[in-house]
Amino acid sequence: MARLVFGMNQSLDGYVDHLAFGPGPELFRHFIEEAQGQAGSVYGRQMYEVMRYWDDDHPEWDAEEHAFAAAWRNQPKWVVSRSLKSVGPNARLVEDDLEGAIRELKAERDGEIEVAGPDLAQSLTELGLIDEYRIYLHPVVLGHGKPYFAGPRPPLRLLANDRIGEDVIRLTYVPA
């Protein structure tokens, strides 16, 4: 049975914003390794559209960006959306019955399946489907934006904390 994991970069004041700050080299390598080992990813529409950047090679990319793109392209993706009519390669659209589709996905697969995007994660949290939360805490303060938890924070228990690179702490929580 697969485990659903929600992990995102977060500011010290609890916000996520991929445009305001991003991973440094060590954290990016960590994300490459994670992507290479994942059984797949579940995206909301907005995050999926952001990630489509990795569909096409870009001449300015270095070897690590090519490695991440390859890992992203190779893994199966499920895109939760009522407005999209089609999705790209290696992706399947989930339009109805979110709970049933994700329960089926977890039952059919093994390994880790990433959940991407705070709004989708909130819906899956409310359904009791997320098995682990990974907060990649960065030393920045945004003051506004989209919070990591898009709704009430669920009761959580700290499982682990570790440093990645010079300035990022990964906090790993499971539902309490």
Model-derived segments and their meaning:
Residues M1-A176:
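Enzymes that bind and transform nitrogen-containing heteroaromatic metabolites
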